[in-house]
Amino acid sequence: DFMGRESGTTFPADGQTAAVLNDYGLRGAAQQLSAYWGTQPYTGGPTYLGAAAVFLAALGIALARGRNKWWIIAACVVMILLAWGRNLMGFTEFAFKYLPGYNKFRTVSMTLVVVQWAVPLLGALALMRLWKGEIPRERLLRALAWAAGITGGACLLLAVAGGSLFDFGRAESADYMTDTFRHIFESNNMRSYIDRGMDIEWAEATADAMAADRAAMMRADAWRSLVMILLAAGGVALFALRRINRYV
């Protein structure tokens, strides 16, 4: 939920955006505004991997044998770079011209399908070595702490301080809402509201509420992801300590 999910996601009826717009007599308007604040004109939402899968992939980086993991890591990195599209235009143009079949892709984000397969595979390699008992307990616990620290720490950072690290599209929302309120006032012969700067004042208040709702969505998702990571890490730790039988 970092970027507001997908283009069609709207603000909740019990959120701050809805409360502000309700005060302006625009009841239900929040459910017509997109919570997405990314740069794509349309998106069906981010590629889903799952927090536990990412944690296990990090564990795989620490535990999987080099010959098995490096090609998976390389594939993930290259596919993510390709998915950046115009944000890494030089690399995108190179791939478009010289990578066979790449110019047939409908969107650059299609490359993330490879990541969806590679990340669980990396986690599976870690679980396979764990199940076979090939890893000394001390090394396993160190790797477990590292993987949980990296992935869980990132979630904790976003949950605690993420609201102050990003603007959540506030500036763009303020511009958009200024135009929207101005159009509403002009359409209803309320020119005096524009003369008093009410279009800008209302837009700023609405943009603040929109950013707050987006930040709340991100924090909730970060806390939820942290819980999933801790549960997965706890399961692996119990297995490592022989508290869970390998055949369970």
Model segments located where?
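Contiguous transmembrane helix-bundle modules in multi-pass membrane proteins
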Residues: A64-V248
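Extended surface/linker regions that mediate inter-domain or inter-protein docking
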Residues: A57-L63
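Individual transmembrane alpha-helix segments
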Residues: D1-L56, M210-V227
